[in-house]
């Protein structure tokens, strides 16, 4: 019935070198151009190159940044060239040939009629061998019922040995002297006659369209298809766009600028990035003393903490182009695409320098080399190698700063994290109470709030929430207010939205009175321990209304953020988790499946106390388990062997069992002492289904739990080690 859930390459593309003047090379230079002409052309090229250098130098003096163009012969300058005209024509001719073959295959040639004499035609009519005719002017075209053998007169004169051809479809011309009896003669011999006026002859334009229309349609379709694929990139990019970067460019002039005013609650991370903005705005301030800007800044934090928003704010404050791309978008099925896209991304950034490149989820391509591929370099490793090359100090990249975000920094390759690539690491933590209130103010700028809606109280009620969580909370509250046809968002809307997010939505479930009573005692056990244990988190709400996967909920939250926990607090938390099972055993003398999640979480907490935090007298101060936080330093690899012996494993199990057993007995002892209050609370829950903090205190007659250091500790508490709302979520009840 419940659980105490903590809310908490192929090689690089070929480079084709062409002379500056394609027709002047080798023999052509000997025979087609004089020495004077060659010298003039060389002088022109030198002058043109000098002009280009002067233009680049002037650009550097104005902006303080090196030119984005690369020197002749450098790898960057040969990253991507336009398709030569000859190649474009080659593809065009190839498409025409394919089109012609397809038309020949799809539209087979019709049988061509054979010109026969008029007398032969009349003779076959007399024999009844003409099936049908079609007349247009003086020309008659028709079909014989049975094919005949016919050899034209010119063929007879040329070579009489040629065999006669079988004729089925024929054409003939009516003599200028009209045969007046032809029509009756045809009808009497059962010939089907068709005719068309001469003035309905097809126009020349119609003939052209009829002849070339299908081919033109095929060509237009291929052109559209190739352009579409080139725009989409990836496999769809085909020949023209396979190596193009998929980065999205955000220019601050094209939309609403994101600034640090839109970022709240993460002041420490924001302060780390202010210097980056200052460098982009005023480079000489730092370069005059020999300083250089960090080439890369790695943003580390849990999902939803605002890493992407911080990167956009840096670009907005500096007023430079912002190129954003997910690391997963670099790699495709075709080998070498990832490295090509990395080169293209940095090339675009150089062309628009100063600029910011933002790579989200860097761990998708930045994992340590050698962990994924077996027996050779993988596509991911080639992409990583190209990123390392682009960020290396050997290439001039002044004015380009790379920002990257990840929630798994420990899996990144060490070469990626060394100074000279990602020089700085900025940790974006979850906001504290003050930070959450500031974030709520940002997200409620356009939301009309009622007078009873206190953002401070809401911030206190949402410990452990990230910026994305708070934004979702405000949106859910606004939607609830709209469904209720209100003109503003009230405190009730925020509370209901919070319960929906943390506890899950209410679900209709028809329960018997016996099931309701058992659930009420289960939740009552959690609530009573939350009231009598010293230092326990406040019990804000208890309900037996099914929510999400839970049949009932006990909702607790701390009064302030907590960052350090004593052993007594953790032991008290385990006692609180086992309060539901203890209440069932005391009242009914039986067990149900409802405490499954409670037991799972209590066991996990006890295991961490023994293996990670050194809270076992038997095992002492030894860490026997890797860190479990996947965001700020998880295990270095997967499937690694445990770092202890079988005997130590048995000792760990014994200590965990001891802690759980002692906590279970303590929970039952306390509930027996407060059995009267437990019965009253369960009865009220069956009747009202949901009780808030004041109603619980009034019904039980108990005061809120005293502070952890106030007097003797009968049981520390049932609070939450992560300072998030402690929620008791019962599982599915067993058979009654």
Curated annotation (Swiss-Prot):
Residues 1-39, 57-83, 706-736 are annotated as: Disordered. One of its GO terms (molecular function) is ATP hydrolysis activity. Residues 57-73 have a biased composition (Polar residues). Its cofactor is Zn(2+). It is found in: Cell inner membrane. It holds the Pfam family AAA. PANTHER family: ATP-DEPENDENT ZINC METALLOPROTEASE YME1L1, METALLOPROTEASE M41 FTSH. Homohexamer. This is ATP-dependent zinc metalloprotease FtsH.
